[in-house]
Amino acid sequence: MTKFETVRGMKDYIGIDAEKIRYLESIFRDLAIKYGYSEIITPVVEEFKLFALKGGEELRETMYVFKDKADRELSLRPEITPGVARAYIQNLQSSPKPIRLFYFGTVYRYDEPQYGRYREFRQAGIEMIGDSSILADLEVLDLLYNFYDKLNLSNDITIKINNIGVFRKIMDKYNIEDNLQEHILHLIDKNKINEALDILEKNIKNKDIIDFFNKILTKKDTKLEDIESLAELEEVSRLDIKSEFLYLFRLSRILSNLNIKFKIDLGFVRGLAYYTGLIFEVLHPSVQFSIAGGGRYDKLIELYGGLPSPAIGFAIGVERTLLVIKDLKVEEPVNVIVIGMSEDAIPSMFMVSRILRKEEYKVVINTKDQPLSKLLPYYASQGFKLAIIIGKQELEKNMITVRNLITRKQISVPLENVEDAIKQTL
C-alpha cells in the first residue's frame, strides 16, 4: 500500500499547534486594525518575474517555479510584499495616501530545511504605501514592538536597525549598477565582507572610500552619540550621506524616548533586494536567526510600473515567533460533552448544544454507544470539564443533568436553565 507523508520541509499543525498559529493571527489582526490598517489577501501564485525583476534570476534556485498549461512561468510566493505592491498598482493607486494594509498568509521557499527554517511557513505583516516621513517609519516600528509586547516578549527582544541608504548613496555616487549593488549587499548580508570590499575596490578605486566603507561595516553596536559624530566627518559630507546618518540619529532618539529596545548596527543589511532606507530585524536571545524584519522600499512600486510611491513594511515569521515563546497559553472555552442515553434524547441534545454554543462554549455531542460509567471517565481524560446528561428520567421531567467531570458535582435543572447550572457547577 502506498504511504503518503508531508513533503520535505513542510509540516502538519494539529490541535493546540494550529490554535497557537490562529492565536498569533488574531493578536496581530486586532492590533493592525487598531492602528488603522485594512486586510489584504493576495494570491499564493504570482508571475515569477514579479520576484525576479528585482531579486534576479538566481532566486529561481530558492523558489517553487513552474509553468502552467498556457506556458506562463509562475511561482509560489516566497514573500508577500511584491504581491501587495502589484495589488496596489492594480487596484489602489488612485486611492488617498497613505494606504495602510496588513496580511497573514503562507509563503514558500526552496531552502534546506533546518531548525527555524521551513519550505512552507506563515508571515504576518503590514505595508504603508505613499508616505516617506519619519512618522511612518516610527508607526511601523511601534506596531511591531507592540505586537511582541502583547506576547510578553518586549523585554526579551531587540530591534536591530540601520539605514541601507548609506551604502546605496555611496555606490550610486560611483555609478555602481543596480545588479552589482545587490550582489555586494548580498555578500555583506552573508558576512562575506572581504569579498564585498574587493568588488568595491575594483569599482571605486579610492582607498579612502574603501577604508571608510570598512569602518562603517565594523560598527556593529553603535551608540547614539557616535552616529551624530559620524554625520560630521569630512568623508560623510563628501559622499553626500550626512542626511542618512542624521535620519538614523533622529529615529534612534525618538525610539529611545518611546522605550523601544533597539541597537544600531551600521554593518547590517537585509538580503531582500528592494530596500532603500531604514531596515530592521527583531532578535531574540534564544535563537540565532531573526524572528521578524522589514524596511523601506521607496522604488519598488515604480519598478513594477506604478507611479513613484514611497513605502515601508515588515513581515513577522509566525513559526519562528512561536519558537521563542516559552509558555503560550491559548485561552480556550469550557469543553462540554452532551450525552443522550436514547434516541428520544437527540432533539434535546441538539437544542442544549445550540444554546451553549451561542454563549461561546465548546460543545461536542457524544456519538459513542457505551454506558455512562465508561463515557464519563473517558471524556474527563480528554479534557472535558462538564457533561450534560439526558437520560430517561431527565426526558420525562424535561430536565437535564449537568455534571462537573473534575469535582463530580452535579445538579439537575430544566433545559432552559442550563447556563445557570453550568455556572453553579464550575
Swiss-Prot record:
Taxonomic superkingdom: Archaea
Keywords: Aminoacyl-tRNA synthetase, ATP-binding, Cytoplasm, Ligase, Nucleotide-binding, Protein biosynthesis
GO terms, biological process: histidyl-tRNA aminoacylation; L-histidine biosynthetic process
E.C. number(s) listed in UniProt: 6.1.1.21
Catalytic activity: tRNA(His) + L-histidine + ATP = L-histidyl-tRNA(His) + AMP + diphosphate + H(+)
Keyword Transmembrane helix belongs to the record: no
Leading EC class: ligase
Gene Ontology molecular functions: ATP binding; histidine-tRNA ligase activity
Protein's cellular compartments: Cytoplasm
Recorded GO CC terms: cytoplasm
InterPro entries: aa-tRNA-synth_II, Anticodon-bd, His-tRNA-ligase, HisRS-like_core, HisRS/HisZ, HisZ
Family statement drawn from the similarity comment of this UniProt entry: Belongs to the class-II aminoacyl-tRNA synthetase family.
Protein name: Histidine--tRNA ligase
